[in-house]
Amino acid sequence: MNDRRLLLVHAHPDDETIVTGATMARYAAEGAHITLVTCTLGEEGEVIPPELAHLASDREGGLGEYRVTELERACAALGVHDQRFLGGKGRYRDSGMMGAPTNSHPACFWQADVDTAAHELAAIIREVRPQVIVTYDDNGGYGHPDHIQAHRVTMRAFAQAADPSLPGTPWQARKLYAIAQPRKLLEESVARMQADPGPFTAPTAVEDIAPGTPDDLVTTRIDGSAYWEKKRDALQAHATQVAVAGTRFALSNGIAQEIHAVEYFTLLHGPEPRRGPDGYETDLFA
C-alpha cells in the first residue's frame, strides 16, 4: 500500500465497473487506496436473467439488496476493499430513468437535498483524504438523474470538504475528474459492434450507447489493459444488469458494447495536465 488515495462517486452498483473498472483495478493493484462511494442500491434497474425477474421493483422487489451482493463481488474482482453507500445503505433510492414516475419518490436521490448529500460525502472525503476524486460530468454521462445528481453532490462536497469555515479538519483534494467517453472512439467502437455484435443487437448509432464526450474536452487516458480480465469478471458479477459474452457486454436493452480496459477522463479541477505525445495525461495522480 502506498500513500495514493483515489475516491470515486458512482450512482448505482455496476456503474463503477462499466466506466471505471479497469482504472480501479489498476490503481488497486499498484497499491493505491481505492474508496468507492455508491449513491443508491439500484432498485429500479431492469433485470436481465429470467430466473431473477421477480426481484424487479414492479414485481416482488428485493433488487436493491441483491445488487449490494453483486457489488461486493465486483469490488472483490477489482481489488477494491473500501466501498460505502452515501449516507449509509438505503439512504437514497434509485430514481429511475429521466421522466419516470419514480423521479418523484420522496426518498429517491434525484429529490435529495444537494447540500445535505454533499455534507455526507464531504465527511467521507475528509476522512479518506483522497488526492484524486472521480465522478460524472454535468450531464451524468447520458442524462440519468442519479448520475446528474452525483455530479452536483460531488462538486458541492469537493468545495465543502476544503472549506475551513465548516466544522472539522478541511481537506483539499488535488484533482477532480469527470468520466469521459471520447466521441471518436465511441464511433469506432460502434462500427466494430455493427460488424460483429456477437450474441447481442448491433447499435445503430453512438447514441445507442452514450452521447460521447467531445474529443477536445478529454484530458486523460488510463491504460488498464493488464486488468481487462478483472473488469470482465466484475461485469459478470453484476449479472442482474449486465450480460457478458467474450469481449462484449450488453445491458438490459441488449445492445452490444465493447469491454474497454482503456478509460478516459476530463480534468475539472487541478493543475494543468501533463500530456504525453498522444495528447493525453496518463496518470490520475500526476
Swiss-Prot record:
Protein family according to the UniProt entry: Belongs to the MshB deacetylase family.
GO molecular function annotations of the record: N-acetylglucosaminylinositol deacetylase activity; zinc ion binding
HAMAP family: MshB
Co-factor note (free text): Binds 1 zinc ion per subunit.
Gene Ontology BP term (one): mycothiol biosynthetic process
Entry keyword Zinc: yes
Descriptive protein name: 1D-myo-inositol 2-acetamido-2-deoxy-alpha-D-glucopyranoside deacetylase
This protein's record includes keyword Zinc: yes
Its job: Catalyzes the deacetylation of 1D-myo-inositol 2-acetamido-2-deoxy-alpha-D-glucopyranoside (GlcNAc-Ins) in the mycothiol biosynthesis pathway.
EC number: 3.5.1.103
Cofactor (UniProt): Zn(2+)
Keywords associated with the record: Hydrolase, Metal-binding, Zinc
Reaction(s) catalysed by this chain's protein: 1D-myo-inositol 2-acetamido-2-deoxy-alpha-D-glucopyranoside + H2O = 1D-myo-inositol 2-amino-2-deoxy-alpha-D-glucopyranoside + acetate
A Pfam entry, by short name: PIG-L
Residues binding Zn(2+), per UniProt: H12, D15, H147
InterPro entries in the cross-refs: GlcNAc_PI_deacetylase-related, LmbE-like_dom_sf, Mycothiol_biosynthesis_MshB
